[in-house]
Curated annotation (Swiss-Prot):
Class of this enzyme: transferase
The organism of origin for this protein: Bacillus cereus (strain B4264)
One GO process term, biological-process aspect: amino sugar metabolic process
Taxonomic lineage from the root: Bacteria, Bacillati, Bacillota, Bacilli, Bacillales
Role played: Catalyzes the specific phosphorylation of 1,6-anhydro-N-acetylmuramic acid (anhMurNAc) with the simultaneous cleavage of the 1,6-anhydro ring, generating MurNAc-6-P. Is required for the utilization of anhMurNAc either imported from the medium or derived from its own cell wall murein, and thus plays a role in cell wall recycling.
Protein name: Anhydro-N-acetylmuramic acid kinase
Alphabetized GO MF terms: ATP binding; kinase activity; phosphotransferase activity, alcohol group as acceptor
Catalytic activity line of the entry: 1,6-anhydro-N-acetyl-beta-muramate + ATP + H2O = N-acetyl-D-muramate 6-phosphate + ADP + H(+)
Residues annotated to bind ATP: G9, T10, S11, L12, D13, G14, I15, D16
SUPFAM superfamilies, alphabetized: Actin-like ATPase domain
Entry EC number(s): 2.7.1.170
Amino acid sequence: MYVAGVMSGTSLDGIDVALVHIDGSGVDSKVELIHFTTVPFCNDMKNDIQQALSIENSNVQLICSLNFKLGLRFANAVKEVCKEANFPLRQLDLIGSHGQTIYHQPQQDGGMIPSTLQIGEPAIIAYETNTTVISNFRTMDMAAGGQGAPLVPYSEIILYRHQTKNRLLQNIGGIGNVTVIPSQLSEKSVIAFDTGPGNMVMDEVCQRLFQLSYDQNGNIAKQGVVVEEVLTYCMNHPFLKMNPPKSTGREQFGEAFVTGLLNRFKKHSKENILATVTMFTACSIVHHYKAFILPYYEIDEVILGGGGSYNNTLVEMLRNGLREEKCSICIQEDIGHSSAAKEAIAFAILANETYHRNPSNVPSATGAKNSVILGNITFPPYADENEANI
């Protein structure tokens, strides 16, 4: 099957789209990346999303409209990846769309029960592309008692398992998440959870203090010095004390967290603050390895992915934090994969599994009671593709 995976993450960089060919289904399926592209958000769209994410500034009218706007943007992004690959859109079998997370609440908070909301109307995508769309992947896992995250471990089992090596897959997107893929693989042996902020805090600090969307290659952070009192404040965040399975997001490490941090530590230089929150991401990752993984597994290889894997300062901090461990650290490209495309590929794989009526959550990662089939299916509007005017 030819499948397009569409991902818009917490970093708000844009829309990632991976066009892949998948042979078969289940953990033995074969996946080939044909083409990958990122379609950046225009400033107006990014501002609308940021407003929708803010409890103080959001409103239901905005979210309702944005749901349809994003659906159209996602559809256009699918058309773009097909155009760039010189691949006929009519030959596309399936689209897996994660959507844009507006709010994710994995645990009950007072009268608010566990819930999640991703938008980007699948009917718009299906209509514009005349292709079946699988969307809303997280809700069935939560219905089964899970946290709805992380969902990428199933795809990581397919793509990264190794006969002799115990591997850690560390994604550093807006949020960091890790998956343990043991060489002696069984579903229950796969551990996965969020490790805390990935790029989210760094990017927010960079935007506020330097008017830049991100710290390219970690060049600014490299000029600063880590401030211990600020790092201690960050490392005392309650999320780091929770046991897996667990997930987090902008609700805990977004604008409110950064506002509190900057107000509390105004006396320190901009460069030092950025260096410290970069170290916070590194230390939160290392903390979770030492607390929840390394006591149980001897790790041979740590494979970094996501935008944070291109931050040389962050990667060096991680290397220093894991220097005593006997494991190599590399990025996706070192083993023939793409850091940027990883999550979009994951949702193409999950869509393929849903199409074949296969469960694709990993209960040991999400905390769900059992394995379930993920996602909602939206069929194309035309029974005969020749009726479509596309």
